[in-house]
Structures are given as C-alpha cells and as structure tokens.
Amino acid sequence: INYWILLRNKEFMKYTLCVSSFYIAIYAFLTGSPYVYIDVFGVPTEYYGYLFSLNIIGVMLMSAVNRRIVSAMRLDKLLRYATMFAAICVTIVMILMFMGEHSLWLIVIGSFLFFSMNGVIAAVTNALALERAGKMAGSGAALLGAMQYGSGIISSLVLTFLPNNSAFPMMSVITIFVIICAILAFPRDKRYDH
C-alpha cells in the first residue's frame, strides 16, 4: 500500500521520474556506445575501455564537486543547474550532428559532459525524493531504485527498434530523455519557498 501512496505523491514522483529519465539516457549510452565507438568510428576494441573510463572519471569528479557545493546551494537549484547543463551539452551535440559533424570526439566529449552530471543528478534526486517520502523512506528507496535501474529496459528496447548505422539513434535517445529530465527538474520546489 505504501507504493500506491508514493506513486500518487507528486513531489516524490517528480524526482523519481527525473532521475529515471536521466538513467534512460545513461543506459542508452551504456547500450549504444560499444557499437558507436567500435563499429561506427572504428575504435579498436581494446581502447573502448579507456574511452568509457573517461565518463567514470567525470562522475567521480562531479561527485566530489557535489559534496563541496551541496551545503551552499539549495538542492532543487543544484538539480536544475546540473540537468540544464547536461541538456544543453547533448543538444549542442545533436545540432552539430544535424549540421554534418560526425566525429568520434564530438560524441566522446558530449557523452563525457552529460554522463559526468550523474555525480550530481543521481545524488540530489535521491535525496529530494526520499525527503518527500517521509516515513515511507524505505519503500521510497525501493521504488526509486526499481524505477531508476529498471529504466534501462526502455532505452534498450528503443535502441533495438531504431536503425542502427550511426551515432544518431543513441544520441537521439540520450538527448530526448536528458531534456525530459531537465523539464521535470525545472519547477521550483515549493518546500523551499516557505
């Protein structure tokens, strides 16, 4: 019954759907990047891990930054900045791709910038969502985790049905869901207005 109550809790669901949307984009990268890097751009298999590790370094750096600024900034504001930054980065990549720029480094840098924001977005949305769950924080954590990590199914299914001969399908899914994430994060949190 707690899950039903939480599903109807608009503030909890706002942050849960926000992070789930971001994770659809993350899983689109995890699912699509081996094909894009190795098959589309011809990166040798043994070097894929190095390119992928750049994203992990970015997450670690942004997690460290998040720890330093979280006490100085409202969480909802920090979330808006992080999601907007990620959305702007992937949108620029898509615009450049539509203009004919199809370089490996465009994808690597764009992916690094968006993926790095996971160090802020995941931590902040989880904190805000669980705060809104109140006494049902245990059930909230379970529901949040199920939706966040279960969201990978969506990106895998979408990428399966899209034509897969370029970086466009992967970057399209990433861009759409990062923008959805930013839209969900954008309204001010009313709790901070009191």
Role assignments for model-derived ranges:
Residues 1-16:
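Juxtamembrane intracellular "pre-TM" segments in multi-pass secondary transporters
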Residues 115, 126-168, 173-174:
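A late C-terminal transmembrane helix in Major Facilitator Superfamily
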Residues 175-194:
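Multi-pass alpha-helical transporter architecture, strongest
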Residues 18-30, 38, 118:
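Conserved extracellular-gate-facing transmembrane-helix segments in secondary transporters
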